[in-house]
Amino acid sequence: DVHCHLTQDGGRVLVEEMHLRTELDMRGESKADEPGVLEDDGVQRIRIPLVPYDEIFTPEAMEAYGAYFQLFSEPALFPCYLHCWGGADRTGTLVYLLQTLLGVSRADAVLDYELTTMSVWGVRYRRFEPFAQMEKRLLQWYGTDAQTMQTAVHRYLRDCGVAERELAMVRANLTDRG
């Protein structure tokens, strides 16, 4: 687990300079008993395991994704950081959905996802089959040809149990457009 080692100075910067409040941990059950990286410094760890890509449509996954977006609606959560084990698949999926909901262009959200290529898992790109399947299913099941990916993600999150007021709070917390 050397790839996730936080230096003492890095921890100090996160706590003292960035005033980090929350660690959102997407890793699975094998990491359930591990303490949060900065728990001793008062940073709350919230662990909700996620699955990536086209696995996001199961009832269990939708409940978990809904829980994350409900958390994003809480101002007290911020500033926060989120992570999985490698920083590519689960993190990439959650951040893609978040950015898309917030109105980031598809081109920019996909480009940001492609930056997960720098993780320990290697090349990730827009034609990576699981990612492409996720986008295809979002549009097939939650949008129409005339609608955007943003609309499809919004509808997906409503199906995940996230209320309209919570989605509005996510926007208010993370953009200057509210």
Spans of model-derived segments:
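Cys-dependent protein tyrosine phosphatase-like superfamily
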Residues: 1-81, 93-178
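Ser/Thr-glycine-rich phosphate-binding loops at phosphate-binding pockets of nucleotides
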Residues: 86, 90-91
